[in-house]
A protein has these predicted regions:
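Contiguous, well-folded functional domains in the mature portion of proteins
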Residues: 1-137
């Protein structure tokens, strides 16, 4: 799941699950734009820009939250850098200005809502789909 944050969006990242923080990695990189133009014209921009990656173990497996810095706004901060456990909805990190969040989920662990399509604007607390066997809410 790629969630682009425009300058007018909310710039805080909340945990999508209750779970344990397994690892945190800060990868230095470029700060190319990650807007529609940047994604279209810059090869692998989401893996070339600066990233702050959080790996979390949860009831249905492991996920990675990749916070991607962008041109002029590569300022990604953990809300509580010492946290080892988060509840679903807890604030994890924030951008001091807009950028992008990439959520990597194990295959088969999550089912997206059928009405969710590319370009759909989502807000904090709105579901993207369902976790686990039988895809329970």
């Amino acid at each position: 799941i790629v969630l682009y944050l425009s300058p007018s969006d909310y710039h805080r990242v909340h945990s999508p699950v209750t779970g344990t923080i397994l690892a945190k990695i800060h990868l230095l990189g470029r700060t190319y734009p990650v807007n529609e133009f940047g994604l279209k014209h810059m090869s692998k921009v989401l893996s070339r820009n600066e990233r702050l990656i959080t790996y979390m173990g949860h009831l249905y497996g492991i996920l990675s939250l990749v916070k991607v810095g962008a041109m002029n706004v590569s300022s990604i901060k953990y809300t509580n850098s010492l946290a080892t456990h988060l509840n679903k909805g807890d604030e994890l990190a924030y951008f001091e200005f807009g950028s992008t969040v990439v959520l990597l989920i194990e295959n088969g662990a999550f089912e997206f809502l059928q009405e969710l399509c590319i370009g759909t604007q989502v807000r904090v607390g709105e579901p993207l789909g369902y976790w686990g066997a039988g895809f329970q809410k």
